[in-house]
Amino acid sequence: MPEITVRAKSKTYPVYINEFALEDVREKWTESLAKFSHVFVLTDEHVAELHKAKLDAVLADLPVVTYYVAPNGEEAKTFRVYEDVMTKLIETGLDRKAVLIAFGGGVIGDLGGFVAATYMRGIPFYQVPTTVLAHDSAVGGKVAINHPLGKNMIGNFYQPEAVIYDTQFFATLPEREMRSGFAEMIKHALISDQTLLRALMDTFTEPKDFYTKDLTPFLQRGIEIKANIVAQDETEQGVRAYLNFGHTFGHALEAYGNFGKWLHGEAITYGMIYALTMSETIYGLDFDLAEFKTWLKQLGYDTTFDATVPFNKILENMRHDKKTTFNEISMVLLEEIGKPVIFKAEDDLIFETYKRVMRNGGNGI
């Protein structure tokens, strides 16, 4: 089975990925889990309904397993749900020898990791992602919940014991969720590898390809790209910020939509178009943005922007971005495909780019 090793400064751990990863690691994993005093599984309503039986079968021989089922979507990454999970942990009597399993998409991985990082100052946890999007969020140790004023504003860096990535779960993902996760695969290609981007564009040309083509080698490459960056910079003091390409504008848009109007990958797609447009202005980026947007449309993405989204709200949200320092908004731009840079953008440039993007496609968000 393909295995990728993540070598962060604080911990080294494996990422297991294939179509039957849960079954393939079952014996070794359950032996490890049996050493803990209690196994606590955090999942959401949708994953519990579809896939709980699969995880139950793997954990069947363990003496003590408790589930917490969170609401679906970004609603789970709130103070209210975080407090409720903590209450459940305390009432259940989990001690420091317990372990948490985050079983779900990126939201559950973020929430579960943050719960594990903060319960009794930290207990071990495993990531068992079930979505394409989670190939990015499950690796690297970023864990967080949202604040009404910004996405992932309350969080930590806390690495899992392992990531068990069973791609059989993708079969039940709606097309919109597949597309959202695929956006992060596009991001990894843009910041690292023109050849990878071309391979994605040649392989995936319509929505059904998400289900009929093999995503695994592309997911592996994306995880390898992220693992290499995390090995250099675990806590985002430097190059790890490159992984935020498209996220400064994207997170601002998510916040404007109250973390529900757009899925994460949908917002990041708009953010990547915005960042590519600014990269053309600042660095003369040699990139066929029109071809790129046409490809995105073929895959079902909406690439047009709605002029009714108020710039002042987006700018305010961008100021709350974690890369913003001394009130200067930091953008991840591209000098060329595979060559990201951090650029301090002034308000005038942010507005001019906003207007340019609107001119190139409006009334679509």
From Swiss-Prot:
Keywords: Amino-acid biosynthesis, Aromatic amino acid biosynthesis, Cobalt, Cytoplasm, Lyase, Metal-binding, NAD, Nucleotide-binding, Zinc. Pathway: Metabolic intermediate biosynthesis; chorismate biosynthesis; chorismate from D-erythrose 4-phosphate and phosphoenolpyruvate: step 2/7. Its main location: cytoplasm. Its cofactor is Co(2+); Zn(2+); NAD(+). It catalyses: 7-phospho-2-dehydro-3-deoxy-D-arabino-heptonate = 3-dehydroquinate + phosphate. NAD(+) binds at residues 106-110, 130-131, 142, 151, 169-172. Catalyzes the conversion of 3-deoxy-D-arabino-heptulosonate 7-phosphate (DAHP) to dehydroquinate (DHQ). This is 3-dehydroquinate synthase. It comes from Listeria monocytogenes serotype 4b (strain CLIP80459). The lineage of its organism: Bacteria, Bacillati, Bacillota, Bacilli, Bacillales. The gene is aroB.
